[in-house]
Amino acid sequence: MKSGTTPFIGASDSNNGVTAFVSNTNVSKDSNVLGVNYNGSVVENFYHPYTCIFSDDVKRFALREHNGNEYVYLFMKTVILQQKSKYAYGYKFNEERMQKQMILLPTTANGQPDYDYMEQYVKRLFSALK
């Protein structure tokens, strides 16, 4: 890795997962995603609204059918973290388990994820902190 200004996201549980700043690039360059650790600090995850590069130990989680924002991804972060106790050294959180992991989300009347509710919920939490 060459030193630079682009955040490099590793399987860390601190500093929003940023373990270095680099100038090189690769196919893992992304933004507006959750970086979910499946090695190292397992299931720890951070929201990355900025462009960054991800290590092989961090999977990028992006919504397919919805343009996620900070609030929706922070809601998702918490839901994903609730799975942490399930995984340990003997039962590793790998890519296959990550893809099969079921998470419970609020839904609309037609059974679709209620992204508006998720966004408003986090916004209310933020406003309560002010």
Q: Where are the regions that the model predicts?
A:
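Compact, glycine/acidic-enriched structural inserts
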Residues: 61, 66, 83-85, 89
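A short beta-sheet element
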Residues: 20-77
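Catalytic micro-motifs at enzyme active sites that drive phosphoryl/nucleotidyl and oxygen chemistry
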Residues: 47-49, 86-91
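DNA target-recognition patches
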Residues: 1-19, 25
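Short, structured motif recognition centered on aromatic/hydrophobic residues
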Residues: 6-9, 58, 72-80, 118, ...
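Amphipathic alpha-helical coiled-coil/heptad-repeat segments
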Residues: 97-130
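A short glycine-rich beta-alpha junction/loop motif
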Residues: 52-59, 90-109
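A conserved ligand/cofactor-binding region detector
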Residues: 11, 26, 42, 66-69, ...
